[in-house]
Each structure stands twice: as structure tokens, then as C-alpha cells.
Amino acid sequence: MANILLLDNFDSFTYNLVEQLRNKNSNVLIYRNTVDINTILNSIKKIRNPILMLSPGPSTPKNAGCMLNLIKKVKGEIPIVGICLGHQAIVEAYGGIIGYAGEIFHGKASLINHDGLEMFEGLPQPLPVARYHSLICNKIPKNFIINSYFNDMIMSVRNNLDYVCGFQFHPESILTTSGALLLEKIINWASLKYKG
């Protein structure tokens, strides 16, 4: 059972994500990105082996309340998982570059290619996923690897040193056919930070 602090970036998918996590027996504590960062940091300190999960949301990482500062405060200390806007914020907080995708993807099902490792091990290749975004990662930060892509677009990244990963697509969407299994594998991978 994982202990997850979920930062809600005011997205309609947030509670789909919460439901899937709770269905896998995870404890999920939710804070909106407008909450004072010190309140969130104090909560993290009280959680045993916390995983910070960053929800999807509108706009850009810079406009997502305390999210960027929160990542900068806890990176390297606890595992972090980001979805869509959360993924973009991870990339930006670690020094990567986010830019416009050139088109808007809203409810688009795409077949992505992945590396078959860690959270993607045993999943279909290519993997059908749901995409809702207008921004993408243009340059990954140091110590990150690209572990999935669609054409030339980065769809996910992973940092094996800090146990941080981000997904441009939505594992919690019904259009991501193996999404529940992928989320379970993501949480299992992030939890490895506390086993080493």
C-alpha cells in the first residue's frame, strides 16, 4: 500500500486518478496547488514513505500555484510522479525545456512506443494512450531518460537516481487501455526509492 500526496492542479481528471489509486489500496491525501507550500511540506513530513503525485491541469507549470516550488523543495528526497501538466512541471523544475506542441491534442488516442523497462515492462508495444495537451517537453533535464515517445514527441521521462517520472499522456483515462496496470507499475517503481 502506497502513501500518496496528490497535488491537484484543478483538472477534471484528478478524481479519476484518485479513484484508480484508491482502488489499488493506496492512501491518497489531496491538496490543491493554491494551498500554502509549508502546509504541504509539513504534511509530507508526517507521511511514511510518501510519493508526491502531480495531477494534470490547465495552463503552464509557471501558472500552477505552488507546484514548481514544491518540486524544487522535495526533489531527490521523495519520489515524484507527474501526469501531463505535472510531467511538464517536473521537466521544468529540473532544468528541461517545455514548449508548444504545434497543435492541441484533446482526447486524442495515440500509439506510443516505449522502452519496455521499469513501469513499461510487460505492457503492449505500441501502447494506446490518451493525450490532452498543447505543451510538450522539448529538452530533457540532466539524469533523465526518455522512456516513451510518439513520432518525435517525448511522451514520458524517468530519473532513476531520484525516482522521478513524468507522463505527457493520461494513464487514468479510459483511452489508455492498460492505464490501471501502468499506474500500479508506476507506484511500485516509485516505492523502490525506500527499499534501497
Curated annotation (Swiss-Prot):
Instruction: Output the SUPFAM superfamilies linked to this UniProt entry.
Output: Class I glutamine amidotransferase-like
Q: Where does L-glutamine bind?
A: G57, P58, S59, Q88, S134, L135
Q: Where is the Glutamine amidotransferase type-1 domain?
A: 3-196
Tell me which Gene3D superfamilies the record gives.
Answer: 3.40.50.880
**Catalytic EC class:** lyase
Pfam families listed in its UniProt record = GATase
A cellular component term (GO) from this record?
Answer: cytosol
- Report the PROSITE patterns cross-referenced here: GATASE_TYPE_1
Known EC number: 4.1.3.27
- Reactions listed under catalytic activity: chorismate + L-glutamine = anthranilate + pyruvate + L-glutamate + H(+)
Protein name (Swiss-Prot/TrEMBL): Anthranilate synthase component 2
Its source organism is Buchnera aphidicola subsp. Schizaphis graminum (strain Sg)
Q: What is the name of the gene encoding this protein?
A: trpG
